[in-house]
Amino acid sequence: MKTTYVNATIVTMNEQNEVIENGYIIVENDQIIDVKSGEFANDFEVDEVIDMKGKWVLPGLVNTHTHVVMSLLRGIGDDMLLQPWLETRIWPLESQFTPELAVASTELGLLEMVKSGTTSFSDMFNPIGVDQDAIMETVSRSGMRAAVSRTLFSFGTKEDEKKAIEEAEKYVKRYYNESGMLTTMVAPHSPYTCSTELLEECARIAVENQTMVHIHLSETEREVRDIEAKYGKRPVEYAASCGLFKRPTVIAHGVVLNDNERAFLAEHDVRVAHNPNSNLKLGSGIANVKAMLEAGIKVGIATDSVASNNNLDMFEEMRIATLLQKGIHQDATALPVETALTLATKGAAEVIGMKQTGSLEIGKCADFITIDPSNKPHLQPADEVLSHLVYAASGKDISDVIINGKRVVWNGECKTLDEERIIFEASRYKRGLQR
């Protein structure tokens, strides 16, 4: 089926960051087959023409690091540093999860993401109390594009660790799909929660299955001190010594990196998921994204979980990301709007291995979102589109979300998830958690 979306202002995020006024996009099934300016002449003999009535159309946002299974934990453990937050609040609560609660929590996160303009994401979930197949089915039902990864820890006995490795390898073999809507990565939690043997096994699984790796790394000064004291190496060098960087790797955070480490990461195709709000809220610090980009590191913006953010609004992350770089460098030119948008769209897609999305160009997947500025005073005057998207817009402004050519959100209504039921069940399951 061919559908044309006409009368739109199109933010292409192509190589020229071209913005097309009064343009149209032609979609055939799941692919974009044309993007042009001017009046549509129906040269392609399309089946349906939809008038966007001047809406802004931009690529769907790509969240490079989150934990949607934790969505019921919003507001629990505020105003705490990372380690006590994990050890006294998050992990004890996650130990109470049941398969049904995990699905309800996941649905809430998916609903929030897709209604606020995120179309693709990379996720890590703690497998305790979780039916991994049910989580994957839930994500698939949402219509979103995702890399959903089972997190590995070295908690418990060596036998427990061995079993975790076996389960993770089965999971990777079952769900890894380089070009599909749903895939996975090998996901050791971090250097401070995984043994050397576990990290080495994760590296082996990634190499043998040709998958990517996703890990929390260099998130805090404490992590760097502890790893250096234990292994005689900083986290980057230690992770490399375990073989993790033999495959393209996404490190979440990268807050505490020096110049040599940034150069090393760029050389070894290690990408960074930048979580500005989460890093600020947990008191972890501010990642030097400007220096990362100058070193040649691929960077994508991310939200982390609602437990440490406390929302999944990628527009908010874009804005805080650019403002932080301007502030810490005392340089108003740091991370300009075009770069911020890139780090939330095509740049983010590249970070998590989804090059088929992230821009509105011929041959790309039909993943795009729309905003109607006509009834929004904070987006007026409406002629500075790129500026408004980064500095003024929010996820609440989203009208429509098309993923893989399908209308997942239309006129603000989610078509794939039951919003009323999800919100009701979220409250019901949250009450059952013992705090």
Swiss-Prot record:
<dbReference type="InterPro" id="IPR050287">
    <property type="entry name" value="MTA/SAH_deaminase"/>
</dbReference>
<keyword id="KW-0862">Zinc</keyword>
<feature type="binding site">
    <location>
        <position position="150"/>
    </location>
    <ligand>
        <name>substrate</name>
    </ligand>
</feature>
<feature type="binding site">
    <location>
        <position position="216"/>
    </location>
    <ligand>
        <name>Zn(2+)</name>
    </ligand>
</feature>
<feature type="binding site">
    <location>
        <position position="94"/>
    </location>
    <ligand>
        <name>substrate</name>
    </ligand>
</feature>
<dbReference type="InterPro" id="IPR023512">
    <property type="entry name" value="Deaminase_MtaD/DadD"/>
</dbReference>
<dbReference type="Pfam" id="PF01979">
    <property type="entry name" value="Amidohydro_1"/>
</dbReference>
<keyword id="KW-0479">Metal-binding</keyword>
<comment type="function">
    <text>Catalyzes the deamination of 5-methylthioadenosine and S-adenosyl-L-homocysteine into 5-methylthioinosine and S-inosyl-L-homocysteine, respectively. Is also able to deaminate adenosine.</text>
</comment>
<dbReference type="GO" id="GO:0090614">
    <property type="term" value="F:5'-methylthioadenosine deaminase activity"/>
</dbReference>
<feature type="binding site">
    <location>
        <position position="189"/>
    </location>
    <ligand>
        <name>substrate</name>
    </ligand>
</feature>
<dbReference type="GO" id="GO:0046872">
    <property type="term" value="F:metal ion binding"/>
</dbReference>
<protein>
    <recommendedName>
        <fullName>5-methylthioadenosine/S-adenosylhomocysteine deaminase</fullName>
        <ecNumber>3.5.4.28</ecNumber>
        <ecNumber>3.5.4.31</ecNumber>
    </recommendedName>
</protein>
<feature type="binding site">
    <location>
        <position position="219"/>
    </location>
    <ligand>
        <name>substrate</name>
    </ligand>
</feature>
<keyword id="KW-0378">Hydrolase</keyword>
<feature type="binding site">
    <location>
        <position position="65"/>
    </location>
    <ligand>
        <name>Zn(2+)</name>
    </ligand>
</feature>
<feature type="binding site">
    <location>
        <position position="67"/>
    </location>
    <ligand>
        <name>Zn(2+)</name>
    </ligand>
</feature>
<comment type="similarity">
    <text>Belongs to the metallo-dependent hydrolases superfamily. MTA/SAH deaminase family.</text>
</comment>
<dbReference type="InterPro" id="IPR006680">
    <property type="entry name" value="Amidohydro-rel"/>
</dbReference>
<dbReference type="GO" id="GO:0050270">
    <property type="term" value="F:S-adenosylhomocysteine deaminase activity"/>
</dbReference>
<feature type="binding site">
    <location>
        <position position="304"/>
    </location>
    <ligand>
        <name>Zn(2+)</name>
    </ligand>
</feature>
<feature type="binding site">
    <location>
        <position position="304"/>
    </location>
    <ligand>
        <name>substrate</name>
    </ligand>
</feature>
<dbReference type="InterPro" id="IPR032466">
    <property type="entry name" value="Metal_Hydrolase"/>
</dbReference>
<dbReference type="InterPro" id="IPR011059">
    <property type="entry name" value="Metal-dep_hydrolase_composite"/>
</dbReference>
